[in-house]
Each structure stands twice: as C-alpha cells, then as structure tokens.
C-alpha cells in the first residue's frame, strides 16, 4: 500500500507542468513624485504608464531611472495600495518593448493587443485571467507620504 501511494505521488509530481520563471526580467528603479510629476496616481483608483520615449509623447526617465523591459504600469488600487507591473506581455513568444499591454477603458484589466491575454490589475494582482502561463511581472513599490520608489 505504501508503494502504491509513493507511485501515485511520484506520478503527480512528474506530470505537473512547471511554469518556470516569468520571462520578463527588466531592470527597474523609478522615483515617484505624487505632488508633481505623478500626481494623477493620488486618486483611487488610478494608474499611470511609463513608456520608453518617443520625443514629446512618452515619459522621459530622469538620470538613473530604469523602467523595465516594456515600460511600467503603476496602479493605485481601490484598497489604497500601490502596485507596479512591467508592460511587456510575458505570454508572447519573445517578450519585448514592442508588444506591451494596454489598460482597458474601465481600468479593470490590461490587455495584450497581440495575443489577447487579459491581466487583472484593479485588484493589484496582475494575474492572467485565461489559462496562460504567466501573470504580469510585478515589481516592489514603496510609498511614503508624497514620494515613492519602484524597484526590483
């Protein structure tokens, strides 16, 4: 009987698919200024995206700041928590800054325009809503008063 239990346990362990590590791995260090540059994040709920620059269109990082592989999405959830995610879709064959998720109109989800994967962001989880391998890559965020830091 013990052997049968051991065989079943071994089979279960071998048959489970290993997800491996999230393929999105960008370097992140971003200072938040909730009084000026990032004041739109003070509202609940709210979000802001930080994209690699196209002159006059997107965010231009300050000296020493890094915004991940595809850019950053910072969310202020209804529970007054801040969360940060990489915008690169982790379920693309080769995640990069050319295929980034976009926040939908009601701010519930972020959606990849290429593969169609939806990620839950309003609750701060970043999980994939369909049966995809990976959720959005999350980063540490620390907010104190009117400033904060996003890092990995």
PLM regions: where:
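N-terminal pre-ligand scaffold of iron-sulfur
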Residues: 19-103, 120, 137-152
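Positively charged n-region of N-terminal signal peptides that target proteins for export
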Residues: 1-4
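Short cysteine/histidine-rich metal-coordination sites, predominantly Zn2+-binding motifs
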Residues: 103-115, 126-139
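Short helix-onset patch at the extreme N-terminus, typifying the N->h transition
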Residues: 6-8, 22-23
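C-terminal motif of bacterial Sec signal peptides marking the signal peptidase cleavage site
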Residues: 12-15
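Residue-level signal for mature regions of secreted extracellular proteins and peptides
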Residues: 9, 82, 105-108
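Short, flexible helix/strand-to-coil boundary loops that buttress conserved ligand/catalytic motifs
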Residues: 123
């Amino acid at each position: 009987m013990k052997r049968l239990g051991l065989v079943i346990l071994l089979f279960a362990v071998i048959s489970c698919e290993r997800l491996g590590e999230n393929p999105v791995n960008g370097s992140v260090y971003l200072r938040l200024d909730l009084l000026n540059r990032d004041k739109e994040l003070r509202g609940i709920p709210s979000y802001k995206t930080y994209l690699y620059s196209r002159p006059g269109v997107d965010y231009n990082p300050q000296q020493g700041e890094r915004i991940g592989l595809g850019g950053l999405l910072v969310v202020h959830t209804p529970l007054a928590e801040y969360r940060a995610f990489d915008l690169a879709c982790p379920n693309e064959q080769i995640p990069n800054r050319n295929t980034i998720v976009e926040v939908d109109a009601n701010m519930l989800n972020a959606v990849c325009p290429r593969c169609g994967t939806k990620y839950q962001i309003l609750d701060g989880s970043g999980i994939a809503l369909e049966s995809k391998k990976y959720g959005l890559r999350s980063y540490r965020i620390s907010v104190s008063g009117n400033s904060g830091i996003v890092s990995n």
